[in-house]
Regions:
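Short glycine/proline-centered loop/turn elements that form peptide/ligand docking sites
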Residues: 297, 320-324, 341-346
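Short amphipathic alpha-helix that is part of the acyltransferase structural core
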Residues: 2-68, 191-227
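Acyl-donor-binding surface of acyltransferase catalytic domains
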Residues: 1-24, 98-195, 340-344
Length: 346
């Protein structure tokens, strides 16, 4: 991404941050405390209640929440906040994370939210202000001279979230569309491109090569940075990851493309159908626009059909430089909902 003169100044010098953070003041109805690693079940239950308003078709699993709180570079007691009501029930949480080892962009992510039945009472404003201060502290602790973004995502169907971010100074920067495809009516898989390409199910021995290919394939994607080994391993070790439903494209022993799949059966009742989620789709640059992504996706959809899944779901950056949206719609995917990526640039 382009580097400005401002970006050449170390973050420690260009970001103003509070020297210390205090917990928000308690009230007659609400109490605040820092997050703990053992809060995963409590926060998962809260996230499920939030999802009814924000994204009714899915919610974070307990394993995903544990992973978020237990990463080596996350300290929930310093980076997280929990709000409870007078009875001790969780009504809001926030987590601030800065992934390690950026190459061209330092990113800080703000996650969390407020139970819909407690919105409109100032909890979200208090939470977001604290998170933003913590994000600035993280940036100001870095000696890197790189562009830096503080980022958060909001669902269009819950406009109060986007309005809250805008009030804090965030701008709507990018749109991500959720697409669905009826597996039974999907177009058949096309042939793999010429050049000795073979498409195989994901296997453990391919894992590191797929991670490297992922980083190469996503190098020119908006907001993307290389995924480290810890993050990658956490992803493929989640119970929802499905190696037999994921596909890898190889030329000799080189990974040139991939599609990863996840299945969370807990989401099926709320969706009204069985589904697989396509998490990552990528081809390394020399193999783009040769039909490889379509062939990989077709192979994955065939695997979904054999597994008895009714629909495939994925999310796509609507302005992706790879033309991914056109690839998906050509296969029979149709848009359903949309999320907005908000950011503040430092």
């Amino acid at each position: 991404m382009p580097v400005t003169e401002n970006d050449r100044i170390p973050l420690r010098e260009r970001v103003q941050a509070p020297s210390s953070l205090t917990l928000p003041a308690d009230s007659a109805h609400y109490r605040w405390r820092t997050l703990r690693r053992d809060d995963a079940a409590l926060v998962t239950s809260l996230a499920e209640r939030m999802s009814v308003r924000d994204h009714p078709a899915w919610s974070e699993s307990l394993e995903e929440m544990r992973d978020a709180l237990e990463r080596s570079w996350v300290d929930p007691s310093a980076d997280g906040l929990l709000c409870t009501d007078a009875g001790g029930a969780a009504v809001a949480y926030g987590l601030v994370t800065m992934p390690p080892d950026p190459e061209s962009l330092v990113r800080v992510f703000l996650a969390g939210g407020v139970d819909p039945t407690h919105r409109g009472r100032g909890i979200g404003r208090t939470l977001l202000a604290w998170q933003h201060d913590r994000a600035r502290q993280m940036l100001a602790s870095s000696d890197l001279a790189l562009p830096a973004w503080v980022m958060s995502h909001a669902a269009e169907i819950a406009p109060e979230h986007g309005a809250l971010l805008a009030r804090e100074g965030f701008e709507a920067a990018r749109y991500f569309t959720t697409l669905e495809c009826e597996v039974a009516s999907a177009l058949p898989a096309g042939p793999a491109p010429e050049g000795g390409v073979r498409i195989e199910p994901f296997r453990a021995e391919y894992s590191e090569a797929v991670r490297v290919a992922k980083n190469q394939a996503f190098a020119d994607h908006w907001g993307s940075q290389p995924m480290g080994s810890e993050q990658w391993q956490s992803m493929i070790e989640l119970p929802t990851f499905r190696a037999p439903l994921s596909r890898v494209a190889l030329v000799d022993d080189e990974v040139v493309g991939f599609v990863t799949s996840e299945v969370n059966e807990d989401d099926w009742a709320r969706q009204g159908f069985s589904s697989g989620y396509i998490g990552l789709v990528g081809t390394v640059r020399p193999w783009r626009r040769r039909g490889l992504a379509s062939a990989l996706l077709g192979a994955v959809l065939e695997a979904y059909s054999l597994a008895g899944l009714e629909r495939a779901v994925l999310d796509v950056d609507t302005e992706s430089p790879t033309g991914a949206l056109g690839v998906y719609t050509a296969l029979g995917f149709t848009p359903t909902t949309r999320d907005v990526a908000y950011r503040i640039v430092y």
